[in-house]
Amino acid sequence: MLFLRLLPLILCFSGLVHAEHRVFTRKDGFLSMRDKLNVYFFRSDTHRLLVRDEGSVKTPRYGSLDKAMRKSPCVAGVNGGFFSADAEGTPLGLVVQDGKRLSPLATGSFAVSGVVYEGGRDGLTLVRSSVLRRMRRLPAMQAAIQGGPFLVENGSAVKGLNAQKSTYRTFIATDGGRRWCIGVSSSLTLKELAAWLAAPGALGNFRVATALNLDGGSSSAFWCHETGISYPAFKQVRNYLGVAPVERR
């Protein structure tokens, strides 16, 4: 009986769990507020990314992350990339949904410094936008979202990140191999979040090699089917990034 209760924990620390939701907290000082991360871990050999685009923020196709995920084969999801303040909420940067490019690759802003994409031969990949910009032709993509800035690169927190503005944050990260996670944070500066993600043991046995910031603030949203948790955005966003099991043929 005790073994059955401990089995999920044993599997977690042995690295056999393919996907799970976990919450991490910390306090910097006795009088400080408790910081929190809601994180969904998954493996790129058992799960894939899906993009769900609203089409317009004025007349959205879904209306919320929760509805978008429930109408898809997703087990977890977060809000996606940045978008403009016009009536349609035009995406800022590359958006690919089900193999169709909805918005082109953008450059010249920290908000579009990186791209996470689900490709055919390449699998799940997180790269700098400049790498794709130098290509004569973009690789095949089934799903893609552009965001920024990078929070962690080569296992270290990126230097020069904003240390003044605190707000909710959304991110995607990888250990450099097949282990990935999506997550949202409580109100933090970019510098604080980067330092937290890069700290050894911050996400248990998941060591962050690269992490990319997505749209945050009032756009931040998190949804997990397994635990029934749904943290909606405070405003209508343009697109979402979901995690779904790989389709076996």
Indicate where each model-derived feature is located.
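Repetitive helical segments and hydrophobic/amphipathic motifs
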Residues: 11-14
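Gly/Ser/Thr/Pro-rich low-complexity, intrinsically disordered segments
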Residues: 16-249
